[in-house]
């Protein structure tokens, strides 16, 4: 995560990742088949944690208070995970089309929380 955030997905090698986590390069393949799978897993975990944390938020009846709660949640969640957020937004272009579609679907689910509020507030 740190290496991708600092140097970018394309600039980081599997050898660098292995050295960073303290294993031999060959041993890294026991945990992930390739760099693409690692990137996808990091992004997927980030989005699933975001969705889970959002579901855990209490629902407020007042639309203005609901927008405020959503905004505070969104900002706090993202400030607590700057590397994951950076990767989730900046490295989408490096996903395979299939992996991109999966992450984009998770992102749409999160955005739907805001759109649901918007519709209910009208």
Segments and roles (model prediction):
Residues 3, 49, 57, 77, ...:
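Short alpha-helical functional segments enriched in proximate histidine and acidic residues
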Residues 45-51, 98-122:
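Amphipathic alpha-helical packing segments from all-alpha helical-bundle domains
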Residues 3-37, 41:
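Helix-turn-helix
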